[in-house]
A protein has these predicted regions:
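Conserved, single-site charged/polar hotspot
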Residues: 2-6, 15, 21, 26-468
Length: 468
């Protein structure tokens, strides 16, 4: 009976899944255009040929054929809305668009801007001039080659499963946001506005992890690609999506994340003068910091569990304005020195996958798919290379695993709840018990994501006879 129910769930979404299979397989065969050096004003770049043979097109005409070993390098500069090209003292002219087109499967260009550290990229290079008299550089590259470059730029480590996880979430994001910069004439930029893509991938272990996950994305129960945000370190607890952005998404729920503790970015501190700290809330958020209650709360704010606001002020706004590593911090005040210290945890927005948590989980031997499910609640892996039959079987197995995980989580919740109730019962004084209950109930509910019934609230807690 259970298997039949699961199979019916899979069949219900099967047509959607087949459409997704076709879409993903089609898109992944294509190239993507990525704007590189997007954070820099490039006034000049020298291009040399590291591997393979290239045809250099000026507008739509072949200007020169160049290959590795020929010692050819070309310098490009903006000139009156066009791109000028010169090489070894010879001036080729100025053109609306210049394209370095790869003629071999493996072709690599070395780009050396005048004001930025050089990089190497595979595939084609398209160069145009901007209205600001700078160069716009676009790498036209195979999708999976791009993903490998993103993985190398976004995460550290030395285990294949680390790179497999990052490749899957980066691929999912790229597929879902394929037209993010459509109006600009390319797919993605190379910065965190999209995903970091700061060089071609040169590490074999990253290439292996990307290849082993080729075609794999993350979907929800309808077969739709999910949002896959990630951050450096959660500080021990990830954040709900609605606490950072606008929408509450069922797969972006806050989870305990002990794997992120004791890592490079797990803790931080930042100090302010009391005048600057209180002045920020007074000037920016119009709080009356001369009020004793408000002042006390601002100087003794605590977050044993993640919270979204401090006195109604979104912590995301505080983080941005004061350039904090995260919103997960507590406040202490030294009246002698007049210093306010923020003791913080984690690095980044806190939603979705923690990269350092992923690293630790992989080090402990936890499989890549379990890592993904830990951070994206109820998510399913979509294997593009599967046949329809294998895909449905895999889909069913994943749903069964999610149900089993939910059973285990329910058991853990009941155990924790019973332990918590037991500790309350040991408080002999009824008023003290009610006070402790009111103080801890919200955190317990948030932690275990359940609501107490009226019986628990009225009969079990407040009217219980304390244990001897």
């Amino acid at each position: 009976m259970f298997q039949q129910i699961i199979f019916q769930i899979a069949i219900k979404h099967f047509q959607l899944i087949l459409l997704l299979l076709f879409f993903v397989s089609t898109a992944m065969a294509e190239k993507v255009k990525v704007r590189i050096f997007s954070q820099n004003a490039i006034s000049s770049v020298t291009v040399s040929f590291d591997l393979g043979q290239y045809s250099v097109y000026a507008n739509d005409t072949v200007l020169v054929e160049a290959a590795i070993g020929e010692g050819v390098s070309m310098t490009l500069k903006p000139s009156g809305g066009k791109v000028s090209i010169s090489s070894d003292g010879y001036f080729y002219g100025s053109f609306s668009k210049v394209r370095f087109m790869a003629n071999d499967t493996a072709c690599i260009l070395c780009l050396n801007p005048s004001n930025v550290k050089q990089r190497t990229y595979e595939g084609d290079l398209i160069v145009t001039a901007t209205k600001q008299n700078t160069l716009l550089l676009i790498n036209d590259v195979e999708f999976e080659t791009y993903i490998a470059g993103v993985v190398q730029s976004e995460i550290y480590g030395n285990l294949t499963d680390i790179f497999r996880v990052q490749a899957i979430i980066s691929r999912t994001w790229a597929m879902k946001n394929l037209h993010k910069h459509k109006k600009d004439g390319y797919n993605f930029c190379d910065h965190v506005h999209c995903q970091a893509y700061l060089n071609r991938c040169v590490r074999p272990d990253i290439m292996l992890g990307t290849m082993q996950s080729s075609g794999v994305t993350i979907v929800d129960s309808t077969g739709s690609l999910i949002e896959t945000p990630f951050h450096s370190n959660s500080g021990g607890q990830t954040a709900n999506s609605e606490d950072v952005w606008r929408n509450a998404l069922p797969y972006l729920r806050s989870v305990d994340d002990t794997f992120s503790l004791a890592m490079r970015q797990s803790d931080w501190t930042k100090t302010f003068t009391v005048e600057k700290w209180l002045g920020y809330f007074s000037k920016t958020h119009k709080l009356n910091t001369s009020n004793d209650s408000i002042r006390f709360q601002l100087l003794s704010f605590e977050q044993p569990r993640r919270r979204a606001r401090i006195l109604g002020v979104p912590l995301t706004k505080v983080r941005m304005d004061l350039q904090l590593k995260s919103t997960f911090f507590s406040v202490s005040y030294d009246s002698v020195s007049g210093k306010v210290t923020l003791n913080g945890h984690g690095y980044g927005h806190g939603v979705g996958l923690s990269q350092e948590g992923t690293i630790r989980m992989a080090q402990l031997g936890i499989a890549y798919d379990s890592i993904i499910r830990h951070y994206y609640s109820g998510a399913l892996l979509h294997f593009n290379h599967d046949s329809p039959k294998n895909y449905v079987e895999n889909y069913i197995q994943q749903i069964e695993q999610i149900i089993e995980d939910d059973k285990q989580r329910t058991t853990q919740v009941k155990s924790k709840k019973d332990d918590w109730l037991g500790r309350l019962f040991r408080i002999r004084d009824r008023e003290e018990r009610e006070e402790v209950y009111d103080e801890t109930k919200q955190d317990i509910e948030s932690d275990w994501q359940f609501k107490f019934g009226e019986t628990d609230t009225t009969d079990t807690i407040k009217n219980a006879t304390p244990a001897e």
